[in-house]
């Protein structure tokens, strides 16, 4: 067999086992763990290449003939960092491994048949990740959806009804009628969507009614009263109906302190929003909750990574919660939530795997298009400050990369009961995939595939003779249009709503699927971010200790994935 140099191989097929790739302009270096190909039998599309009739393409279609093959992709996922062909059929990932013509080529997987019906997408030199999942969405404006989508987010979970004051402050779609209208409005968008009902209710029939109306769970928010009674009732119904509860705890400690909230939770699983506290929650020590086994702790992106500007911008952001900067008590309320010491600790807690999820808090103290970027900026800042993680093996950052990608893919999927459908690059899941050039990883995707169909891509002038002439910018592709979007996007609902036929009741055309397995999980089920610990906060200095050791980080004055890539 003719041999070629590693440099030539990479230029033709992308990096292979042992090759290293830098992510964007960060210091994060991945190493390809293994390559599923058979060397010498690689498939590649194009003139003089191998995906041709009677070569890499078979003449004998089978039940495993693919609709789309993504060739030579570098997959970055909690399951591994490896090279493979990805086969898509009927909108789902049908196989991962070596694709081609089994009649002629060695090593072709049974489920990866390239045939007459197969389209090809070349991923040589590109990284493929699962679409991101943002679980802290205030549905204030529908314009958030394409903004998030263009950043690589393919699932949004939260609540709201538009720019009402309740939605500006809380991620809640309250009541049957509001849920009905939001579920109907969801039909329009290339995005998986799920809505949280109001959990601030001490009357269980009202909670059940929202689940029957299609809510995927409950949100408890201090602006509606995060009392022990509301917490207990919401969790009682969540346990009965297998849905998740998210909580923004009581900043003012009016109905109790953090210990009282933990007592009301009583060891039951709950998803804590902005667990550091600047976004809201028991002052000054809500961060203690992150160490508990039953707490699924999330950050929102204004506080990560910690920079020299973080503290200053938060006061203005806090006013969105229907506060008035001219009212002394409102200013004191806001000021109680902004603690540089706990914000500084948050970055380190992410690096330790104690904080498990990243999210946005869209237009309500967070930026909906920056979840992915902020996650990788935090990873890079922590590597620069703290060095390699002790869990790393070999001269790479693979463990840290898996830890951080899990924070916005598989872990939010597990938390909200949708990991059977989305959240990772695994066979059987919907093909919600994001393609990245390594130089732009984490900041500007090349292309987004939604339910197996291209929905958004960087695209040049439509009047040009080829696809690439300037101006190149994100443009909606066919997956965004017509009835195709009904087949390739999911509306998530509770199991009771699904079983009662809510799709037919509301005349929904999109795929409708139930959430499940929300109550039989703990933090130990979260990938690469399952660390529990005893966390303390000094009530006077706000310094944070983990298992007796102080944790903090420096405020960065420069970040990766920032001005190098953006004009504004």
UniProtKB/Swiss-Prot annotation:
Keyword Transferase recorded: no
Positions that bind Ni(2+) 1: 136, 138, 219, 361
EC number(s) recorded for this UniProt protein: 3.5.1.5
Ligand binding (Ni(2+) 2): 219, 248, 274
Cofactor: Ni cation
Classification via InterPro entries: Amidohydro-rel, Metal-dep_hydrolase_composite, Metal_Hydrolase, Urease_alpha_N_dom, Urease_alpha_subunit, Urease_AS, Urease_asu, Urease_asu_c
PTM annotation (N6-carboxylysine): residues: 219
SUPFAM superfamilies: Composite domain of metallo-dependent hydrolases, Metallo-dependent hydrolases
Domain of life (superkingdom): Bacteria
Entry's Gene Ontology cellular component terms: cytoplasm
Broad class of enzyme this protein falls into: hydrolase
Pfam families: Amidohydro_1 (PF01979), Urease_alpha (PF00449)
Pathway note: Nitrogen metabolism; urea degradation; CO(2) and NH(3) from urea (urease route): step 1/1
Post-translational modification remark: Carboxylation allows a single lysine to coordinate two nickel ions.
Reactions the enzyme catalyzes: urea + 2 H2O + H(+) = hydrogencarbonate + 2 NH4(+)
GO aspect biological process, one term: urea catabolic process
Gene3D superfamilies (UniProt xref): Metal-dependent hydrolases (3.20.20.140), Urease, subunit C, domain 1 (2.30.40.10)
Urease domain location: 131-568
Keywords: Cytoplasm, Hydrolase, Metal-binding, Nickel
Sites where the protein binds substrate: 221
Active-site residue list: 321 (proton donor)
PANTHER family, per the entry: UREASE
Subunit comment: Heterohexamer of 3 UreA (alpha) and 3 UreB (beta) subunits.
Matching HAMAP family: Urease_alpha (MF_01953)
Family: Belongs to the metallo-dependent hydrolases superfamily. Urease alpha subunit family.
The protein's name: Urease subunit beta
Source organism (scientific name): Helicobacter heilmannii
Taxonomy of the source species: Bacteria, Pseudomonadati, Campylobacterota, Epsilonproteobacteria, Campylobacterales
């Amino acid at each position: 067999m003719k041999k070629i140099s590693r440099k030539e191989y990479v230029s033709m097929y992308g990096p292979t086992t042992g090759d290293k790739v830098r992510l964007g302009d960060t210091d994060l270096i991945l190493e390809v763990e293994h390559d599923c190909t058979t060397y010498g039998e690689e498939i590649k599309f194009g003139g003089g290449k191998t995906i041709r009739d009677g070569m890499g393409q078979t003449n004998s279609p089978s039940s495993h003939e693919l609709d789309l093959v993504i060739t030579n992709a570098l997959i970055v996922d909690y399951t591994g960092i490896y090279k493979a062909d990805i086969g898509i059929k009927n909108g789902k990932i049908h196989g991962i491994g070596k694709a081609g013509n089994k009649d002629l080529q060695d090593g072709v997987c049974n489920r990866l048949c390239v045939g007459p019906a197969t389209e090809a997408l070349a991923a040589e030199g590109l990284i493929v990740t699962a679409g991101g999942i943002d679980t802290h969405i205030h549905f204030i404006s529908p314009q958030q959806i394409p903004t998030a989508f263009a950043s690589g987010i393919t699932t949004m979970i939260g609540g709201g009804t538009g720019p009402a004051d309740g939605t500006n402050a809380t991620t809640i779609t309250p009541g049957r009628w509001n849920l009905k209208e939001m579920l109907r409005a969801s039909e329009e968008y290339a995005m998986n969507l799920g809505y949280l009902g109001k959990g601030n209710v001490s009357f269980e029939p009202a909670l059940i009614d929202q689940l029957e109306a299609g809510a995927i769970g409950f949100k408890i928010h201090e602006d509606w009263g995060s009392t022990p009674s509301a917490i207990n009732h919401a969790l009682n119904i969540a346990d009965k109906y297998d849905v998740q509860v998210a909580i923004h705890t009581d900043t003012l400690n009016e109905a109790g302190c953090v210990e009282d909230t933990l007592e009301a939770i009583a060891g039951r699983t709950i998803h804590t929003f902005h667990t550091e506290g600047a976004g809201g929650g028991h002052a000054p020590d809500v961060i203690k909750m992150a160490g508990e086994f039953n707490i699924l702790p999330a950050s929102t992106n204004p506080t990560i990574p910690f920079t020299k500007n973080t503290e200053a911008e938060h006061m203005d952001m806090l006013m969105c919660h229907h506060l008035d900067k001219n009212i002394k008590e409102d200013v004191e309320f806001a000021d109680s939530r902004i603690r540089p010491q706990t914000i500084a600790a948050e970055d380190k807690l992410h690096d330790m795997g104690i904080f498990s999820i990243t999210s946005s808090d869209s237009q309500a103290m967070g930026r909906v298009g920056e979840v992915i970027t902020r996650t990788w900026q935090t990873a890079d800042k922590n590597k620069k400050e703290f060095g390699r993680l002790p869990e790393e093996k070999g001269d790479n950052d693979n463990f840290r990369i898996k830890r951080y990608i899990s924070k916005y893919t598989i872990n939010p999927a597990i938390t909200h009961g949708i990991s059977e459908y989305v959240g990772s690059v695994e066979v059987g899941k919907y093909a919600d995939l994001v393609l990245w050039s390594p130089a732009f990883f984490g900041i500007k995707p090349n292309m987004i595939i939604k339910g197996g169909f291209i929905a958004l891509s960087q695209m040049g002038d439509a009047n040009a003779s080829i696809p690439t002439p300037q101006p190149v910018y994100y443009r909606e592709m066919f997956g965004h249009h017509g009835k195709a979007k009904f087949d390739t996007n999911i509306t998530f609902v509770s199991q009771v709503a699904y079983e009662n036929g809510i799709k037919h009741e509301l005349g929904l055309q999109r795929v409708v699927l139930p959430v499940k397995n929300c109550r039989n999980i703990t933090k130990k089920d979260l990938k690469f971010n399952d660390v529990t610990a005893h966390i303390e906060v000094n009530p006077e200095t706000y310094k944070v200790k983990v298992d007796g050791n102080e944790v903090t980080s420096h405020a960065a004055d420069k970040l990766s994935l920032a001005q190098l890539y953006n004009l504004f």
